[in-house]
Amino acid sequence: MSVVPVADVLQGRVAVDQEVTVRGWVRTRRDSKAGISFLAVYDGSCFDPVQAVINNSLPNYNEEVLHLTTGCSVVVTGKVVASPGQGQSFEIQATKVEVAGWVEDPDTYPMAAKRHSIEYLREVAHLRPRTNLIGAVARVRHTLAQALHRFFDEQGFFWVSTPLITASDTEGAGEMFRVSTLDLENLPRNDQGRVDFDKDFFGKESFLTVSGQLNGETYACALSKIYTFGPTFRAENSNTSRHLAEFWMLEPEVAFADLEDNARLAEAMLKYVFNAVLEERADDMKFFAERVDKDAIARLERFVSTDFAQVDYTDAVAILERCGKTFENPVFWGVDLSSEHERYLAEEHFKAPVVVKNYPKEIKAFYMRLNEDGKTVAAMDVLAPGIGEIIGGSQREERLDVLDARMAEMGLNKEDYWWYRDLRRYGTVPHSGFGLGFERLIAYVTGVQNVRDVIPFPRTPRNASF
């Protein structure tokens, strides 16, 4: 007898007539008049539960088995047999059922066997992984993360752990969470009456990172190809389906790479991870296509078989101005494209993923390489049909004098970035990279509309429960 995951039983990795033990939770119990009960037992290893067939001859049948309800945890031992019923190939003829844990009051159990609204599930985020939806999201999230690591490892990249606490604002937007151990009831003040951060833990103002990019660049300029993957934080007071205060970001950085290299890397990476999900999570993707977004599988299949289009920002604006469509947000050269503009380009004009590049410098970050025209920077956004922007990146400014001028234009103190500037003083090289919001990627793959439902415990304005 061996303990096996439910997935091994259902996917035929266990021989018929072999005795096994599965451990998990009851999804449903059905009793027949013939004195047989059918337990659907899941353990999270795959989408479907395994059916355990339990005869009333078991010694604890009346006292325990007949009282099992949704959510009870059980240890079931029995023989794997071919299932005569429709829906699954194998089931377990139980010879022993142990109850590991009861649900105290089945009538008040938040995850009782009925459909719950997605909004309700956010209120019980500690229990929602037990649902079909959130369980499937969690497995897809895992598969995407593993596929990203695999892709970069196979491409010769090194994973670099960049700090979560920083003194630098990568985006220059100032929407950062402050990290401090100062007594808020008795803040130290300097001669000017301002808070004296010299007395703080780090001896200066410190924040939660908005990006690992600047730190990542330092390692790319020594190891050639690196990526960072971890949590990032934005103190944006945005209550939308696309924003989180804490989210995960993947950021590769490559030395001796220009914007074209960057675009090729982004395309190869996305196609790799989408193929991985289609191959490795077929059961979960089938659920998403049936219950969440009927286009979920077909969208990914189209994506991996389609070449990316490319268009300059200037030409993209011209396309939008000439298209005859009325947008909520006006289109003109110099405007940051909104989601409706991005989706029109990807879904209606190009009908394919599209890389928009060479944006006006005024709407992009200080570290993006200034183009020869002096008006645009070597920035790119990857737009995907169905969602809009999914990746943002650029070739970085490797020329110290130009970088300093851009910082001055944007009102940044170059002394705060002394170490970043050093990269341009000691063996500078062209280099490029991009950022991928991991939760937006998961939302795109699954068809789940709100990023709050693809991260285990969402952090949003006025919400840091659990």
Swiss-Prot record:
Cellular component aspect of the GO annotation: cytoplasm
Catalytic activity: tRNA(Asn) + L-asparagine + ATP = L-asparaginyl-tRNA(Asn) + AMP + diphosphate + H(+)
This protein's record includes keyword DNA repair: no
Cross-referenced SUPFAM superfamilies: Class II aaRS and biotin synthetases, Nucleic acid-binding proteins
Protein origin, superkingdom: Bacteria
Keywords: Aminoacyl-tRNA synthetase, ATP-binding, Cytoplasm, Ligase, Nucleotide-binding, Protein biosynthesis
Family under the similarity heading: Belongs to the class-II aminoacyl-tRNA synthetase family.
Protein name (Swiss-Prot/TrEMBL): Asparagine--tRNA ligase
Species of provenance: Salmonella typhimurium (strain LT2 / SGSC1412 / ATCC 700720)
